[in-house]
Amino acid sequence: MSANQGASGTASDVAGNTASASVTGIDIDQTPPTVTYAGNAGSYTVDENVDITCSAADNLSGVASNTCSDVHAPAYVFPLGTNTLSASATDVAGNTGSASASFTVIVTGASLCNLSTRFSATPQLAHALCVKVEDIDSAPTPGARAGRIGAFIHEVDAQTGKNLSAEEAAILIALANAL
C-alpha cells in the first residue's frame, strides 16, 4: 500500500473563474488479497473425509471476487495420489492473490476394509470382505497377492446388486486393484 499520497488540481469555468484543491492522506491499495486453505490434513486414506475450507480476505479495499470453494467429501471420490486445489481472489483495487493446497489420497488394506464395511448391506458381507483384504495384506508373494485381490473382486462382483450397489462395487474394485 502506498500511504499518505496526495493529489491536487485546478479547474476553470468559461467565465474565467478558477479554483484549486489539494487532498492529502490518500492510501493506494497495492496489496493483493490473501487466499487461505484451512483444515488440510495433507494425507487421507480412502475411508476418511476430506474437509478443507477456503477463504479470501482483503483488509484494505475489500474482496471484489474469488474462486474459493470448500471441499467436504469422502476421500474415495478423489483420484489416488496427489490432488491440488487452487483459488484466486481479486480486490476492489484490482490486485489479485492466489493460493493452492495439495493433499494425497491413499488406499491401505485397513482403509479398504473400513470402506467395505461402510458400503456393505450386511455384517456378514462386511466381515467376508475384510477377511479377504487382510489376506491381501499378508500375501507372501506377488502371485499370492494378485490371487487374493482376485478373490476380493470376485466376492464384490457376486454381491453387486444384492448387498452392494453397482457404484459401491466399482469403487471397491478400483481400490482393490490399486493396492
Residue ranges and their predicted role:
Residues 1-28, 40-47, 59-96, 101, ...:
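Serine/threonine-rich, repeat-prone extracellular segments and beta-strand-based repeat modules
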Residues 30, 58, 105-107:
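Non-catalytic surface loops within mature trypsin-like serine protease
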Residues 47-48, 82-85, 95, 100-179:
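Soluble extracellular-acting proteins and domains
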Residues 32-34:
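Proline-centered linker/hinge motifs at extracellular inter-domain junctions
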